[in-house]
Amino acid sequence: MLGRLLSGKAIGTDELVVRDTKFLDADENIDWEKWAPNGGRVPGTIKENQTIPAGTIIDRYGSQWGKYTSPARVPYEQRALPYIENPNAYHKYEVLKPIDNVTISEIAPAFEQVGGGIQYELPNNIKKLKELDYIKEIK
């Protein structure tokens, strides 16, 4: 994948490409536990069972199958993601109904990124929340 992006073949798609193969395990999957243990959370900053109110704008880099988002405008490097930044993989959502059972935390440094942003772990993935009319994608 990295070679495809660097050769220009993946540019323009919403594909997320890992910045460095050292972030992968033996099966070539991202080794989240090694590089971003504790769900990428800073210990002591975790607030469970929180609610994101209607009207809030959240965003994420990645597919609709993910459950992690941030408040809109958290800088990319503060998200501590293992990917090359791809603006085509950026999605922004408006919360239409309050979302309960959210875990909010500060993002720990990971994948050689500084962290320090805020992350929301949602109770369901983006696809499900869209289907249930909790969120809608916005530009």
Give a label for each model feature.
Residues 2-139:
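Catalytic toxin/effector domains delivered as secreted proteins or via bacterial secretion systems
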